UniProtKB/Swiss-Prot annotation:
Substitution effect: residue 25 to Q: Mimics acetylation, leading to impaired rRNA processing
CDD domains: WD40
Chain positions with Omega-N-methylarginine modification: 10
WD repeat spans: 144-183, 197-236, 239-278, 281-320, 322-360, 374-413, 419-460
Domain notes for this protein: The WD domains are required for nucleolar localization and U3 small nucleolar RNAs binding.
Cellular localisation: Nucleus, Nucleolus
One Gene Ontology biological process: rRNA processing
Name of the protein this chain belongs to: U3 small nucleolar RNA-interacting protein 2
Location of cross-link Glycyl lysine isopeptide (Lys-Gly) (interchain with G-Cter in SUMO2): 113
Record keyword DNA damage present: no
Biased composition (Acidic residues): 65-74
Role this protein plays: Component of a nucleolar small nuclear ribonucleoprotein particle (snoRNP) thought to participate in the processing and modification of pre-ribosomal RNA (pre-rRNA). Part of the small subunit (SSU) processome, first precursor of the small eukaryotic ribosomal subunit. During the assembly of the SSU processome in the nucleolus, many ribosome biogenesis factors, an RNA chaperone and ribosomal proteins associate with the nascent pre-rRNA and work in concert to generate RNA folding, modifications, rearrangements and cleavage as well as targeted degradation of pre-ribosomal RNA by the RNA exosome.
Organism, as annotated: Homo sapiens
Chief site of localization: nucleus
Length: 475
């Protein structure tokens, strides 16, 4: 039996259903054809319904629908999204690594350049402008000596200070706590070195660059060698015929240079407890000595008015002129430049290739005395922060002065004054440049020309705080 006959047998409902299905098909066709303007009332109803559905589809979606869409993200889409995130992370990591490599390369290049300049003795780090003048309240004062401080040294690790004075004693101080770590008392004359110590004014000291040995020289022509850590006496060098006025170790070695009022320079090997040689040339008592890594040393010739550079292997010397008075102090800035001070009040910057000063600052600490009878304040000590443009000078003008060396060391500009009353007989920068140590006394280290009663015989630790200077516009 055909499907039509079966439908007729079942009755009208079946044909009505079929008619309804046919009408549905016709409506869909009419909708898809756009009704072509011929639809009847039923078509109008269909148009109204379709417009309602369009308005519903244009309505803003609810958050639940958005969540459903996220949940409906396929596995393939999730893999793609995660892969993109991973690639972005890799790209960022590679960029950071590239920046780090570039920074490290710049650092290495800068360090290599500094090493080359340092080996040539021409390195000049610009730090002076960053130094902030310390307040008086920030200066730490260490008291322990009975008489004027004459000299001091700072250990290579900046942990301790050794100071010596006219009371013939040596004190080891802790930088952190300011306490005494050890005291080497005055030795009695004729006691045959028991206990070991100095029996006359200690005029100079030096410490080896590895911090192992301490050397001290006095007016009794003796050089005493100590173990710096324990302050145990090791041995005594004799040979000078007058007061020992200057000592310096060659950096990186245990070779010791000494100078004296007997006008000579001597070379010693401390590790082997041996004398090496003697050099002559100065025409008057030598006042001070300094050395760095090269096998040479520099001396301040006092009243003979010369600065000399001693080339030890060649047994030769270079002679420099510039000051008008007694040259009492000297310090190397780097292997090619040095600073010196004299009792005519002048401070000079020198280059080893020039026989005259590159820069000369007259009356560096001003004038003293009645109007018309003024005299410059003597320069009693100088110091330089190694391989930088920062220099310090001391006098008895109630202050320590910090200076900036200009480009090529051809200028000396005043940075600030640090108030300190008394004779500044010794100045030393820490290796890090974080502080400056001053040895203060009521009298000059080499004599008793004046006495400043209000001064206190002390060691002063002056903090040097740095404030980075912003680069100039357009640099």
């Amino acid at each position: 039996m055909s499907a039509t006959a079966a439908a007729r047998k079942r009755g009208k409902p079946a044909s009505g259903a079929g008619a309804g299905a046919g009408a549905g098909k016709r409506r869909r066709k009419a909708d898809s054809a756009g009704d072509r303007g011929k639809s009847k009332g039923g078509g109008k109803m269909n148009e109204e319904i379709s417009s309602d559905s369009e308005s519903e589809s244009l309505a803003p979606r609810k958050p639940e629908e958005e969540e459903e869409e996220e949940l409906e993200e396929t596995a393939q889409e999730k893999k793609l999204r995660l892969a993109k995130l991973y690639l972005e992370q890799l790209r960022q990591q590679e960029e950071e690594k590239a920046e780090a490599r570039a920074f490290e390369e710049d650092q290495v290049a800068g360090r290599l350049k500094e090493d080359v300049l340092e080996q040539r003795g021409r390195l000049q780090k610009l730090v002076a402008k960053e130094i902030q003048a310390p307040a008086s309240a920030d200066i730490r004062v260490l008291r322990g000596h009975q008489l004027s401080i004459t000299c001091l040294v700072v250990t290579p690790d900046d942990s301790a200070i050794f100071s010596a004075a006219k009371d013939c004693s040596i004190i080891k101080w802790s930088v952190e706590s300011g306490r005494k770590l050890h005291v080497i008392p005055r030795a009695k004359k004729g006691a045959e070195g028991k206990p070991p110590g100095h029996s006359s004014h200690v005029l100079c000291m030096a410490i080896s660059s590895d911090g192992k040995y301490l050397a001290s020289g006095d007016r009794s022509k003796l050089i005493l060698i100590w173990e710096a850590q324990s302050c145990q006496h090791l041995y005594t060098f004799t040979g000078h015929r007058d007061a020992v006025s200057g000592l310096a170790f060659r950096r990186g070695t245990h070779q010791l240079y000494s100078t004296s009022h007997d006008r000579s320079v001597k070379v010693w090997n401390v590790a082997e407890n041996s004398y090496v040689e003697t050099l002559f040339g100065h025409q008057d008592a030598v006042a001070a000595l300094d050395a760095l890594s090269r096998e040479c040393c520099v001396t301040a010739g006092g009243r003979d008015g010369t600065v000399r550079v001693w080339k030890i292997p060649e047994e030769s010397q270079l002679v420099f002129y510039g000051h008008q008075g007694s040259i009492d102090c000297i310090h190397l800035i780097n292997e090619e430049h040095m600073v010196s001070g004299a009792d005519d009040g002048s401070v000079a910057l020198w280059g080893l290739s020039k026989k005259r000063p590159l820069a000369l600052q007259r009356e560096a600490h001003g004038l003293r005395g009645e109007p018309g009878l003024e005299q410059p304040f003597w320069i009693s000590s100088v110091a330089a922060l190694l391989n930088t443009d920062l220099v310090a000078t001391g006098s008895h003008s109630s202050c320590v002065r910090l200076w900036q060396c200009g480009e090529g060391f051809r200028q000396l500009d005043l940075l600030c004054d640090i108030p300190l009353v008394g004779f500044i007989n010794s100045l030393k920068f820490s290796s890090s440049g974080d502080f400056l140590v001053a040895g203060v006394g009521q009298e000059h280290r080499l004599g008793r020309w004046w006495r400043i009663k209000e001064a206190r015989n002390s060691v002063c630790i002056i903090p040097l705080r740095r404030v980075p200077v912003p680069p100039a516009a357009g640099s």
